[in-house]
Amino acid sequence: MLKLIIPTVMLLPLTWLSKTHMIWINTTTHSLIISFIPLLFLNQTNSNLSSYSLLFSSDPLSTPLLMLTTWLLPLMIMASQHHLSNEPPSRKKLYLSMLISLQISLIMTFTATELIMFYILFETTLIPTLIIITRWGNQPERLNAGTYFLFYTLVGSLPLLIALTHTHNTLGSLNIMLLTLTARELTDSWSNSLMWLAYTMAFMMKMPLYGVHLWLPKAHVEAPIAGSMVLAAVLLKLGGYGMMRLTIILDPLTKHMAYPFLVLSLWGMIMTSSICLRQTDLKSLIAYSSVSHMALVVAAILIQTPWSFTGATTLMIAHGLTSSLLFCLANSNYERTHSRIMILSQGLQTLLPLMALWWLLASLTNLALPPTINLLGELSVLMAMFSWSNITILLTGLNMLITALYSLYMFITTQRGTPSHHINNMKPSSTRENTLMLMHLFPILLLSLNPSIIAGLTY
């Protein structure tokens, strides 16, 4: 694992030692090279974690998430260039250092084998994200958003720490490899049910589950572009990853406990999709669509069949790339119109025709058009849900319909119509932006050729 962690750590001195005009080139190039390292971890056997060391190892569940995390750093750096253009060099370097330290802690979180280690790193990701939101956000409300983000995450994860120490006392170890061998089956007693709640609540707040999702739209709307990208693409996936990892400890109690949470996530999926139809704020719409997609992942993980796990992993990767792409597009609109209101940026297709193509492709991937991996993930989850209970097909089918509606509503509102009067002079789309959009779409299209590499543990 050090062959991934050490080069990423070395990005920090690289950032601070680069000359002012070379900061962007150096960091982007090096982080792009680093993003190819996780490809070495593919094609592993399913039965064991590839044990690189006692503390860090990877398996078919963490490798796709590592690929996503590392691929996102050069994209975040490319996306941030414009809004940092007026900052002094030291401020730029500090910003990049925050992104890199966030990347390091995320890589270590996804590869940690010791659960206490995983918990500490899971909490560490909070600090750089909080600094990025509260220091580089646009509006004064960013402080409020930061408070929400901090307290939701901390309140959720304190019971997790207590539950982990309890498990450590009873089983004597928290190593994932050992737990597969030693974990005992939980009975459905009151104390065990509380422990199950303590374990899953932290991750459900991170996902976020409908009901504890209020921090997400706030954080997304106020964050700068790189903050939004990493929040949507990777930080939400920490919740799903943690829930999948802890199934070993919580089995078979999940079957007793999952029912209310399944209902809540299905209901929340419909509610948040419906909220999207009434949104005027572009970033808020994409944030709520993230909640509705992740609700599907929560439901899939709680069902706990091999098929639903495959669907959940695929959907997490697909959603990470798609929502990050949508935030980039929203940001490119914001940099030109200086407003997040969709109606004010209508008619942009006539002014930026190539951007309209990216918007169309992004909207279509968001509504899970075949042959994208979004569709594969949603279909796997849909089939798993249907075999669990036939009635769920009504809710999930309705959700797919509403998703298609708000994706096309978003596309039509921002691109079609007559341009507003305040858009007289507008910068054309730069090569940097077009490359950025292409680098989001490229993995989505390539993975649809061989989706088995992101299908997770059970494939």
UniProtKB/Swiss-Prot annotation:
It is an enzyme of class 7 (translocase). It is a multi-pass membrane protein. The chain crosses the membrane at residues 22-42, 60-80, 94-110, 113-133, 145-165, 196-216, 224-244, 257-277, 284-303, 308-330, 341-361, 391-411, 436-456. It catalyses: a ubiquinone + NADH + 5 H(+)(in) = a ubiquinol + NAD(+) + 4 H(+)(out). Its EC number is 7.1.1.2. Belongs to the complex I subunit 4 family. Core subunit of the mitochondrial membrane respiratory chain NADH dehydrogenase (Complex I) which catalyzes electron transfer from NADH through the respiratory chain, using ubiquinone as an electron acceptor. Essential for the catalytic activity and assembly of complex I. This is NADH-ubiquinone oxidoreductase chain 4. It comes from Pongo pygmaeus (Bornean orangutan). The gene is MT-ND4.
